């Protein structure tokens, strides 16, 4: 009886450990990425002087932390945690958006709709290169007058 209880306890611990591991570790964008301004194209938009994106797999989902310097040279930081399931999550620290709606497409691709006051304002499509060394984020948006704008930000894996 004691042996069965002991074996059952070990199996329960093993199963709990396996199930508590983040299911997001296979997402190739998980890791740290540094903006490569030389390879990026921001059009006429003001450009961040520096930016680092850190995607971390957690039990609650993938946590994205963005840190850097804005075009005026002031520090900036924003973050959200999402299961990348297409559901809105709070995005703190982003002056352009208060909600993110990231949706996983596959291990190398996801799409994120930025929202402000409930209205979609920007769509970002992220693609990790086949060699997993480059993250390219293509953003499209419309200004208040409805004119389209866009940018392509290229990040190198750190």
Outline where the language-model segments fall.
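Bacterial N-terminal signal peptides that target proteins for export
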Residues: 1-10
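Hydrophobic small-molecule pocket/channel-lining residues, especially in calycin-type beta-barrels
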Residues: 22-158
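C-terminal segment of classical bacterial N-terminal signal peptides
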Residues: 15-22
